């Protein structure tokens, strides 16, 4: 009999959460991660499912996600412990046929529940499904240190944050040409911040929560982790630049345009036109 803990999706979640903790992005129970699956992914492991799956209603219906399974991190769970006990810290859930709630099919033992940011995740999944024609499957939230630091010293608007991150490392424009969305500070774990994040996810694969963290979206766990890692590396460079007195020279507007043409991407117009 196949064991679900050996599946590609459980093993992928173990690696992503462990790597994020080692990066210092997910202290204590900080951060959350969800991966949209297909029925064919989970069907071989039905023997591992709970005999009586718990049902939890959603705070608002998600009809676009009806009958869709996900693997999610748990509320109050530490990323560093996922590798030690996947079943206690992760869960496979499946949205019901009307999108009004979900059943916990596997994991989240001892009456654990999914991440408190589940509304933000599911709303963002809905928008990324539409924006990418179903390609994006992952939503990752973490407390990337240098990205958080920048929200204290840069004006919190999409064009400026995007432009500075593009200048911090040449690869950034290629990796996230659509730029980085940013919210005002909001109370986490609410439908309101979930809706605001999802609205930005219509246009951007990265969304900053000032003084808190970042949301990233991508087609795979590796791609999503790499997206955040790339932005965080640029933010680290910028933090060092500002601590050394600021930029003396940088990548110019003309060079950014040339970079986009070379790699066949269309950079966010407002960031290109900023100066």
Swiss-Prot record:
Its EC number is 4.1.2.19. Binds 1 zinc ion per subunit. GO terms for biological process: pentose catabolic process; rhamnose catabolic process. Its cofactor is Zn(2+). Pfam families: Aldolase_II (PF00596). Zn(2+) binds at residues 141, 143, 212. The active site is at residue 117. Pathway: Carbohydrate degradation; L-rhamnose degradation; glycerone phosphate from L-rhamnose: step 3/3. It is an enzyme of class 4 (lyase). InterPro entries: Aldolase_class_II_sugar_metab (IPR050197), Aldolase_II/adducin_N (IPR001303), Aldolase_II/adducin_N_sf (IPR036409), Rhamnulose-1-P_Aldolase (IPR013447). It comes from the Bacteria. Disulfide bonds: none annotated. One of its GO terms (molecular function) is rhamnulose-1-phosphate aldolase activity. Catalyzes the reversible cleavage of L-rhamnulose-1-phosphate to dihydroxyacetone phosphate (DHAP) and L-lactaldehyde. Belongs to the aldolase class II family. RhaD subfamily. Homotetramer. This is Rhamnulose-1-phosphate aldolase. It comes from Salmonella paratyphi B (strain ATCC BAA-1250 / SPB7). The gene is rhaD.
